[in-house]
């Protein structure tokens, strides 16, 4: 995570992530019991619509509510839904807990394998190499990619549901974010944050103890967002990067951005006293300093019906045959498995559409 004022969600302070990429180059791409207020998320508001049965579930509460003013170091319980997706022992992406057995992440984080046993989910971590008594390492029972997601066009329908073998126990360190429904509207003045364990620069990994970083960002409307991803040779009509299933957010003034290794992590907004996961880190323009473009996030509300349907139609894991819960491990390396998708807008080196497709196909073969 790159940014001049990005904060660590833990005792150490950190920088932020930076990714360099050419247009259409896809880089190697991720207790103590706690009972919060029993008040369910609100039923109606000008910006938040009723959420049906999901409303009845506890979600979106932390010890820290409302705005946290400049420079304050966040504590470990700040983002209790934040998860790390581990692939064969290395952090590759972020993920977000949405109930006791389900998480959301980006589909492109699973491009190397769809075998659940290849993955682990870390929850309750603030520093990946320094698990606490609240940290949990969870095994994965099922990986459900969106049916319309394609490796050949990894910008669309970039969402995945992850089912755990064992339900988590909620605590101040592990708690789900609320999932918005399809009618949820978030205004630009809402408080929104991104978080993750992404890279500090194009060639600099986050160093031990691998602290969680976060940054406040603003939502950007679609019309303004499209202007950041236009070049003389590739118009928005030829390559429509801003689809209905994504949203745009960032902070170009303070140079805050999510990048490689942050993919699949949450963009959360504070709506009527609850934190909602409104986006999942999807892709971004090159965030070489100075950052010239915002980040693009999978719009969670667009997929709310899909999420409900898949959860309802998927049987619970057979606990009797599930592996035992594992001891929370200490991450020793960040590694080159980390996932991310970058597009670089407004570049001096131009690519025609046919060249871009060729370049994309070459990268796909070597990933």
Curated annotation (Swiss-Prot):
It is found in: Cytoplasmic vesicle, Secretory vesicle, Acrosome; Secreted. CDD domains: Tryp_SPc. Its main location: cytoplasm. Residues 1-31 form the signal peptide. Expressed in testis. More specifically, abundantly expressed in the haploid round spermatid. Residues 68-312 form the Peptidase S1 domain. Gene3D superfamilies: Trypsin-like serine proteases (2.40.10.10). The keyword Signal applies. It comes from the Eukaryota. One of its GO terms (molecular function) is serine-type endopeptidase activity. GO terms for cellular component: acrosomal vesicle; extracellular region. Disulfide bonds join 93-109, 192-269, 225-248, 259-287. InterPro entries: Peptidase_S1_PA (IPR009003), Peptidase_S1_PA_chymotrypsin (IPR043504), Peptidase_S1A (IPR001314), Trypsin_dom (IPR001254), TRYPSIN_HIS (IPR018114), TRYPSIN_SER (IPR033116). Keywords: Cytoplasmic vesicle, Disulfide bond, Secreted, Signal. One of its GO terms (biological process) is proteolysis. PANTHER family: PROTEASE, SERINE 47, TRANSMEMBRANE PROTEASE SERINE. There appears to be no human ortholog of this protein. Belongs to the peptidase S1 family. May play an important role in the sperm/egg interaction; released during the acrosome reaction. This is Inactive serine protease 39. The lineage of its organism: Eukaryota, Metazoa, Chordata, Craniata, Vertebrata. The gene is Prss39.
